[in-house]
From Swiss-Prot:
Condensation of UDP-2,3-diacylglucosamine and 2,3-diacylglucosamine-1-phosphate to form lipid A disaccharide, a precursor of lipid A, a phosphorylated glycolipid that anchors the lipopolysaccharide to the outer membrane of the cell. Pfam families: LpxB. The keyword Glycosyltransferase applies. Pathway: Glycolipid biosynthesis; lipid IV(A) biosynthesis; lipid IV(A) from (3R)-3-hydroxytetradecanoyl-[acyl-carrier-protein] and UDP-N-acetyl-alpha-D-glucosamine: step 5/6. NCBIfam families: lpxB. InterPro entries: Glyco_trans_19. SUPFAM superfamilies: UDP-Glycosyltransferase/glycogen phosphorylase (SSF53756). Belongs to the LpxB family. GO terms for cellular component: membrane. One of its GO terms (biological process) is lipid A biosynthetic process. GO terms for molecular function: lipid-A-disaccharide synthase activity; phospholipid binding. It is an enzyme of class 2 (transferase). This is Lipid-A-disaccharide synthase.
Amino acid sequence: MTEQRPLTIALVAGETSGDILGAGLIRALKERVPNARFVGVAGPRMQAEGCEAWYEMEELAVMGIVEVLGRLRRLLHIRADLTKRFGELKPDIFVGIDAPDFNITLEGNLKKQGIKTIHYVSPSVWAWRQKRVFKIGRATDLVLAFLPFEKAFYDKYNVPCRFIGHTMADAMPLDPDKNAARDVLGIPHDAHCLALLPGSRGAEVEMLSADFLKTAQLLRQTYPDLEIVVPLVNAKRREQFERIKAEVAPDLSVHLLDGMGREAMVASDAALLASGTAALECMLAKCPMVVGYRMKPFTFWLAKRLVKTDYVSLPNLLAGRELVKELLQEECEPQKLAAALLPLLANGKTSHAMHDTFRELHQQIRCNADEQAAQAVLELAQ
């Protein structure tokens, strides 16, 4: 670090989740080094914290193979330009936030030029395409990992990795207020309540909604007072879910919510959800759950051969055992889903034990991630 200029940190975030992480990291760094300079690819939150944006984050936020191919020339141009400009700027450190397909190659380019690099948020190398770990090891000086089993994986391959905890675990209380959440959603305190979360992608909602609704119908037979809340991520998914409901369960009364997934989880006695980040959030909300997931047969066949983990849901990966019931493919059908949910709705020994384990796991990954990340960046930069 030269005397005549402030600590200079280059960052690239490629989507909203990365923008949130980047903003938290910049905030924590500014507390320690008030005159630090931040520059790179940033979204609105990072820019609000003072990051100078050479490119808008939206330029990188492309989903799906067709969209990526359509934008490939532009993406390659941006990466080449950043390699050149960061090479000239010689920042004290580069932090690639998630977006591994874009960032890991960029990190490798910069490391060759003598710039220290950090990759913030491990891709799921522990689950599939494990050989990527070697490329990550060559490209980065340090990986910042949200979860302890990720660090254990990198340690096995001698790739420097630091477990910093999960920002979502920092943001959510250890003991959520169920009744307050019910008041917000208009759910009586004494009713049984089930949350249905059929996924955030169109393909998931299409595959899972009908069986999730049929499961709720079966549970209503045992619990006639059952309140059913269905948070949907946007208007498109809501429209899709309403169409499926009109065909499958037109008479089933449910509360459709725009967003509010977290409130729905906190308010509910049990949740039925697709896998993914929602399962982690549900664990942190202390809501007992069943994971139901189905994909096209060929995709599942392929996934079974590629995925190297025993479980699909993060609570089970964290616990190292089947804490949460996972019903996949042909197992994901109404009778089996309802049978797995019944003991959770009874709010007895099963759900209490699950709740206690969720709380222990929450404490394990609640480490003040923004502060930990900032500390790691400064240690490497100086």
